[in-house]
């Protein structure tokens, strides 16, 4: 095997069909191509031209070099110790390149799974625990910890974290902080005694479908603290980039690997236990209540968890069933303690919103609970009064009702 690769793979004529593909798709193809080129010591363009030449010359199937090349490459990947899924992905990408360049491939024997190394299935015991997360998170710099908390409490993927913005964070939470300038808003949101849930619209990377991402109070506190930390950095000159989680995903991967080794968390399913995607799995496993409590109020269904992480709806369901963000927020408030690491929270429905507060029995929180209760009762009374007015108007008719209103206003 000699090393040779195309100087500018992305510009290769063979990859024109990938022009409008996502970054992830392009990355997946490039990984397979580089291995294929390196193994054969030829560029992908040379390999495709060779196959097209054989096709033009009508070489019999049993003498085709392209078949030998693909099968030899498959054997190399097996001997290299790659797992079944990775080998299958690489092979499918290479075959796809040939076919997209009008090379007709004859029947190829499917990959024999018995020849391939298989990783152990990841079980519940392999999922990170709250105690393990509480050991690892304080060892991260604040901006890195903020990204981790978005995955832990929001179930976001490493890629989805890239699309959160400071502007959305400030504006969508303005109803709570009610501050005019960004720094004052961040200071309020960074205060642990001001817990709020943030719900924001994102697009799931895999499917391209929008969904409502929900981040818990601890994630909001940490993100706000991280932005204040960034604001004070000399290199930022007291400015803030609009990218909310200002840590590159490759940096996140590297730091998680370092911490996994440092803390001795080991591996599961052939991968480190402490890695970005494992934080998303923690959210999916724990938020359903399966790890902590079997009380009815702390349990939600698998379908509801799927919807929180942007999965689950078919195209038909997505056409007819529209997600109510308020319902999603209430649902999250019910189970937020399942993915909270340092605090316990209570929640209260107020009109069309849900407010959360620390459940610590301090004087300040008792006062807050009392205020929330009074406000909730007042809103309920107004709602009942509004319903009675509507009923009266329906009974009397619009004309009589308007006359009564005019008389009342004139009398006052």
Specify the residue positions occupied by each region the protein language model found.
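N-terminal core-binding DNA-recognition domain of tyrosine recombinases/integrases
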Residues: 12-24, 30-122
């Amino acid at each position: 095997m000699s090393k040779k690769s195309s100087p500018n793979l992305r510009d290769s004529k063979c990859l024109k069909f990938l022009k409008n593909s996502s970054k992830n798709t392009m990355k997946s193809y490039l990984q397979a191509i580089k291995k294929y080129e390196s193994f054969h010591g030829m560029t992908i363009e040379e390999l495709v031209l060779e196959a097209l030449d054989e096709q033009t010359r009508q070489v019999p199937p049993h003498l085709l070099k392209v078949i030998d090349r693909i099968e030899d490459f498959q054997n190399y990947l097996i001997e290299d110790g790659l797992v079944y899924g990775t080998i299958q992905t690489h092979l499918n990408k290479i075959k796809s390149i040939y076919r997209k360049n009008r090379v007709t491939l004859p029947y190829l024997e499917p990959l024999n799974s018995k020849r391939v190394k298989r990783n152990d299935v990841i079980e519940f015991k392999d999922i990170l625990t709250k105690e393990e997360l509480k050991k690892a998170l304080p060892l991260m710099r604040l901006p890195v910890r903020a990204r981790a908390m978005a995955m832990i409490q929001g179930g976001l993927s490493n890629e989805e974290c890239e699309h959160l913005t400071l502007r959305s964070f400030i504006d969508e939470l303005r109803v709570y902080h009610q501050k005019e300038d960004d720094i004052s808003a961040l200071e309020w949101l960074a205060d642990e005694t001001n817990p709020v849930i943030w719900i924001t619209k994102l697009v799931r990377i895999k499917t391209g479908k929008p969904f409502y991402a929900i981040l818990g109070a601890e994630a909001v506190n940490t993100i706000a603290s991280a932005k204040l930390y960034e604001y004070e950095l000399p290199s930022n000159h007291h400015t803030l980039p609009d990218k909310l989680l200002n840590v590159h995903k490759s940096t996140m991967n590297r730091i998680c690997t370092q911490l996994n080794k440092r803390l001795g968390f080991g591996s599961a399913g052939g991968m480190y236990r402490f890695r970005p995607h494992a934080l998303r799995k923690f959210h999916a496993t724990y938020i359903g209540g399966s790890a902590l409590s079997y009380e009815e109020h702390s349990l939600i269904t698998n379908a509801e968890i799927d919807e929180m992480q942007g999965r689950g709806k078919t195209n038909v369901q997505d056409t007819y069933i529209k997600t109510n963000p308020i319902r999603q927020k209430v649902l999250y408030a019910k189970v937020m303690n399942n993915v909270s690491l340092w605090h316990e929270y209570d929640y209260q429905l107020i009109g069309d919103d849900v407010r959360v507060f620390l459940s610590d029995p301090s004087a300040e929180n008792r006062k807050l609970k009392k205020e929330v209760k009074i406000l909730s009762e007042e809103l309920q009374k107004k709602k009942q009064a509004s319903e009675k007015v509507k009923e009266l108007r329906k009974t009397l008719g619009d004309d009589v009702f308007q006359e009564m209103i005019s008389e009342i206003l004139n009398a006052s």
